[in-house]
Amino acid sequence: MSKTTPDRPRRNFYGRIKGKTLKPNQRTYLDEDLTPLAPGPVSWQDNPTRQPLDLNALFGGRETWLEIGFGGGEHLVHQAASNPGIGIIGAEPYINGVAMLLGKIRAAGGDNVRVHPGDVRDLFDVLPAQSISRAFLLYPDPWPKKRHHRRRFVTPEHLEPLARVLKPGAIFRVATDIPDYVRQTLEEVPRAGFEWLAERPADWRQPWGDWISTRYEQKALREGRVPHYLTFRRLEG
């Protein structure tokens, strides 16, 4: 008998899943809005055979973008409102952030956002190859201690599956205020099949033209840290 269910990989997850007690309205958002906004069966429990998501059915054939760790959702909702012809999937395991995003989606309206409240690696499993046109990684957890650097997103464990799901020529944006995270990003991302598009220092010092500053970035600026805006392009092959 052929084996149809792949072995579930062992994945350690680091970081918060839940913070302060949710407000009543946030619990309502989770109860009422999360299931309708799901991108499809992503978890191993719901999709043990890891069948690919049908993005054409999900977004009516629209181009698809991905935000990895959307925090409170400011940037994701801004992009969705500014680009109604694009479908955007956000992945975030921190349930308080998910609830904040759902509230913003209610206020903004629109039908082009889907939300995965969990580990983006599970989402990578079920995204079709070369299906994503743009990806965002904005102020990810810096894991500042050296022994924890392997927990950062910019490692082969995350970058290789990201590269698989991005179309050739797709754009990958990274924003961070941590100099050592910049260093690791510039070392690891090109190795995964990307080219850095900066031609001059101003290219990483200036925010993107469609950028909206997030709460985390405002906190970094108040504390004297310098944002870096890195743009990469997925290479062919």
Curated annotation (Swiss-Prot):
Q: In which pathway does it act?
A: tRNA modification; N(7)-methylguanine-tRNA biosynthesis
The organism encoding this protein is Ruegeria pomeroyi (strain ATCC 700808 / DSM 15171 / DSS-3)
GO molecular function, a single term: tRNA (guanine(46)-N7)-methyltransferase activity
- Key words, A-Z: Methyltransferase, Plasmid, S-adenosyl-L-methionine, Transferase, tRNA processing
Function per UniProt: Catalyzes the formation of N(7)-methylguanine at position 46 (m7G46) in tRNA.
Q: Please state the Enzyme Commission number of this protein.
A: 2.1.1.33
Give the transmembrane ranges.
Answer: none
Indicate the residues that form the catalytic site. Answer: 141
Q: Which GO terms describe its cellular component?
A: tRNA methyltransferase complex
What's the name of the protein? tRNA (guanine-N(7)-)-methyltransferase
Q: Does the keyword Transferase apply?
A: yes
Query: What family, per the record?
Result: Belongs to the class I-like SAM-binding methyltransferase superfamily. TrmB family.
